[in-house]
Amino acid sequence: MLEEAGEVLENVLKASCLPLGFIVFLPAVLLLVAPPLPAADAAHEFTVYRMQQYDLQGQPYGTRNAVLNTEARTVDADVLSRRCVLMRLLDFSYEHYQKALRQSAGAVVIILPRAMAAVPQDVVRQFMEIEPEMLAMETVVPVYFAVEDEALLSIYEQTQAASASQGSASAAEVLLHTATANGFQMVTSGAQSQAVSDWLITSVEGRLTGLGGEDLPTIVIVAHYDAFGVAPWLSLGADSNGSGISVLLELARLFSRLYTYKRTHAAYNLLFFASGGGKFNYQGTKRWLEDSLDHTDSSLLQDNVAFVLCLDTVGRGSHLRLHVSKPPREGTLQHVFLRELEMVAAHQFPDVSFSMVHKKINLADDVLAWEHERFAIRRLPAFTLSHLENHRAGPRSSIMDVRSRVDSKTLTRNTRIIAEALTRVIYNLTEKGTPPDMPVFTEQMQVQQEQIDSVMDWLTNQPRAAQLLDKDGTFLSTLEHFLSRYLKDVRQHHVKADKRDPEFVFYDQLKQVMNAYRVKPAIFDLLLALCIGAYLGMAYTAVQHFHVLYKTVQRLLLKAKAQ
């Protein structure tokens, strides 16, 4: 039999029997020469940033899961159940997000552009409005954000094409496409999220002591440094509240120079406080007040507090608003400061619209609106300066709050307004006859835009979510070092949640590596098995009836020779 098979093979090769040779040799040739998929096409690894997960006042917020291992689809697909739904920011909407959740999607991955500053403003505004809605509801679906690259964009486009074809084709076309199309299995490398125990929220305090007796009035300047957004690792907080911290640091620099010389050393204590946990109901400020007012006898807050000025989101726009819980009474230093702000804005910066916004404290709310309300609850006169009209404005809690949203000239202008008004209060310049249109900070003492820009660049060069800023990290050590250059008695204050009844709980696994593996659908294995079975059946039949095949080939060869 083997001799006959060899003779047939030799005859086939001599006669160039192409159809038969094609059938016999094609499978082997394909197996030998078919190249494997390139590594970049077979799998792609990229970094993903998980949506917020935290508990505040016992209420859970954000996504509760971190593990992902499911096949990718886009929102155009008819069936999203147990699928990883890919969405691009430019096509994202709250309706699409809700559709994925309603259909019990396995996960949601939102793909962000590489250059956030280039995103159209209507898309930015829309997403800023959606972010609070996404966080307001607890979800068990893992929600991730990824920054697009070429490979990830290619994965999205291929998945979108596959999803769209399934919705528009006939049943037979869908079956064929399902059997032959490529898919992507999305897998995260991390474990399930766990609560972080003993996490510390850190605040930094420093002071400039006034010249004179012990009972000098104290002006407190406060700004929280942490940022907030739907994803902690993407929360840069340029305007909210990088701008507030930038102004606080510049004020510390300016007044430290004034307090260096006896001739300009004022009879006011200046207390600077860079608070942590501002986006989590002002936890750093709350603990600082408790420690200063309830547990110590040597705090400046226990003495003659003139007023507390909180700085929050002052980096853009032509408006400045002083938010108060109770309008200042005439004759008080709070009212004097309000009047000075109005005069400086009107006479030196007429393009700025200044106003006061009165909002009572609602103790029934889980989260206070503004930071000054923490002080007002403890009966300390306080207000917040911001360009925002209300505390619910989108820029206060958005990953879209990037460096480009802060206008350097506007931030410098607002810093000058605040510095001029404070100086007029501290040195009583209006009562001494200084014209309102005469600037105080000029020449060597002027507000430095370069300094403010460098601080803003530093602040927005890293995410500043409260869950990410360790007390021994470089950010807090740099902030403390910066304040130590200009202030005295600089020190840290720490807040740790109570173990039995914690006010806040943070969770880990906020940044992971995700792998996208190119896979064939399960039905492809069935189709491949059928094809292999058919081929083996044909080969078996050919072997069993080899004598018939041999005679047929001989007959064909004789006819060829006869011709």
UniProtKB/Swiss-Prot annotation:
<keyword id="KW-0732">Signal</keyword>
<dbReference type="GO" id="GO:0160063">
    <property type="term" value="P:multi-pass transmembrane protein insertion into ER membrane"/>
</dbReference>
<dbReference type="GO" id="GO:0043022">
    <property type="term" value="F:ribosome binding"/>
</dbReference>
<dbReference type="GO" id="GO:0009966">
    <property type="term" value="P:regulation of signal transduction"/>
</dbReference>
<feature type="signal peptide">
    <location>
        <begin position="1"/>
        <end position="42"/>
    </location>
</feature>
<feature type="transmembrane region" description="Helical">
    <location>
        <begin position="523"/>
        <end position="543"/>
    </location>
</feature>
<feature type="glycosylation site" description="N-linked (GlcNAc...) asparagine">
    <location>
        <position position="428"/>
    </location>
</feature>
<comment type="subunit">
    <text>Component of the back of Sec61 (BOS) complex, composed of NCLN/Nicalin, NOMO1 and TMEM147. The BOS complex is part of the multi-pass translocon (MPT) complex, composed of three subcomplexes, the GEL complex (composed of RAB5IF/OPTI and TMCO1), the BOS complex (composed of NCLN/Nicalin, NOMO1 and TMEM147) and the PAT complex (composed of WDR83OS/Asterix and CCDC47). The MPT complex associates with the SEC61 complex.</text>
</comment>
<protein>
    <recommendedName>
        <fullName>BOS complex subunit NCLN</fullName>
    </recommendedName>
</protein>
<feature type="glycosylation site" description="N-linked (GlcNAc...) asparagine">
    <location>
        <position position="241"/>
    </location>
</feature>
<dbReference type="GO" id="GO:0160064">
    <property type="term" value="C:multi-pass translocon complex"/>
</dbReference>
<feature type="topological domain" description="Cytoplasmic">
    <location>
        <begin position="544"/>
        <end position="563"/>
    </location>
</feature>
<comment type="similarity">
    <text>Belongs to the nicastrin family.</text>
</comment>
<keyword id="KW-0472">Membrane</keyword>
<keyword id="KW-0325">Glycoprotein</keyword>
<keyword id="KW-0812">Transmembrane</keyword>
<dbReference type="GO" id="GO:0005789">
    <property type="term" value="C:endoplasmic reticulum membrane"/>
</dbReference>
<dbReference type="Pfam" id="PF04389">
    <property type="entry name" value="Peptidase_M28"/>
</dbReference>
<comment type="function">
    <text>Component of the multi-pass translocon (MPT) complex that mediates insertion of multi-pass membrane proteins into the lipid bilayer of membranes. The MPT complex takes over after the SEC61 complex: following membrane insertion of the first few transmembrane segments of proteins by the SEC61 complex, the MPT complex occludes the lateral gate of the SEC61 complex to promote insertion of subsequent transmembrane regions. May antagonize Nodal signaling and subsequent organization of axial structures during mesodermal patterning, via its interaction with NOMO.</text>
</comment>
<dbReference type="GO" id="GO:0032991">
    <property type="term" value="C:protein-containing complex"/>
</dbReference>
<dbReference type="GO" id="GO:0061635">
    <property type="term" value="P:regulation of protein complex stability"/>
</dbReference>
<keyword id="KW-0256">Endoplasmic reticulum</keyword>
<dbReference type="GO" id="GO:0043254">
    <property type="term" value="P:regulation of protein-containing complex assembly"/>
</dbReference>
<feature type="topological domain" description="Lumenal">
    <location>
        <begin position="43"/>
        <end position="522"/>
    </location>
</feature>
<keyword id="KW-1133">Transmembrane helix</keyword>
<dbReference type="GO" id="GO:0050821">
    <property type="term" value="P:protein stabilization"/>
</dbReference>
<dbReference type="InterPro" id="IPR016574">
    <property type="entry name" value="Nicalin"/>
</dbReference>
<dbReference type="InterPro" id="IPR007484">
    <property type="entry name" value="Peptidase_M28"/>
</dbReference>
